A protein has these predicted regions:
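Conserved Class I S-adenosyl-L-methionine
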Residues: 60-138
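Conserved catalytic/acceptor-binding region of the Class I
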Residues: 11-79
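Short, flexible active-site-adjacent loop segments at beta-strand->alpha-helix junctions, enriched
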Residues: 4, 32-34, 90
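Alpha-helical structural elements of signaling/regulatory helical domains
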Residues: 8, 53, 97-101
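Generic hydrophobic/packing signal
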Residues: 3, 24-27, 136
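A short SAM/SAH-binding and catalytic strip from SAM-dependent methyltransferases
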Residues: 1-10
Length: 138
């Protein structure tokens, strides 16, 4: 589901209907930075961390599929400041960017973490995430 926003939901639901056995279920899961924390919202923007879903969002699904259950929860990942740079380098925006954009992103993240927020090099940070999961059944 982390890629659900890249597919046509109508076509994807049709294909799921074709490949999922009768009585089978599909689970769509989003793990996103919890941008309800202002510093995380800015971090997500600097890192170009993709879609920001509003709390309570529902993914687009089409017949014969329907959402029968939801799980919404939060969790924390502990990362050192350098690991946030490593995480940024996994984002699609970073991967498709050239050296000049990557250099600017790296400097922006360095500035934000160390100058603006005054975190120390190597400091362990609690990064809040939000997980939204949806069970689809026919």
């Amino acid at each position: 589901a982390q890629t659900w926003h890249w597919v046509d939901a109508t076509d994807a639901c049709r294909e799921l209907d074709r490949v999922v056995r009768p009585g089978g279920r599909v689970v769509l899961v989003w793990n996103n930075l919890d941008v309800s924390h202002p510093w995380i919202l800015r971090l997500a923007r600097i890192m170009h961390s993709g879609d920001i879903q509003r709390p309570g969002f529902l993914p687009e699904v089409h017949a014969p599929w329907r959402i029968t259950r939801e799980l919404r929860t939060g969790w924390v990942q502990h990362l050192r400041t350098q690991q946030l740079h490593d995480l940024m380098a996994t984002r699609s925006y970073w991967l498709k960017s050239g050296p000049a954009v990557r250099e600017r992103m790296t400097e922006n993240l360095r500035w934000y973490l160390h100058d603006r927020l005054e975190f120390h090099e190597g400091q362990l940070l609690a990064i809040p995430y939000r997980t939204d999961a949806f069970v689809l059944e026919r």
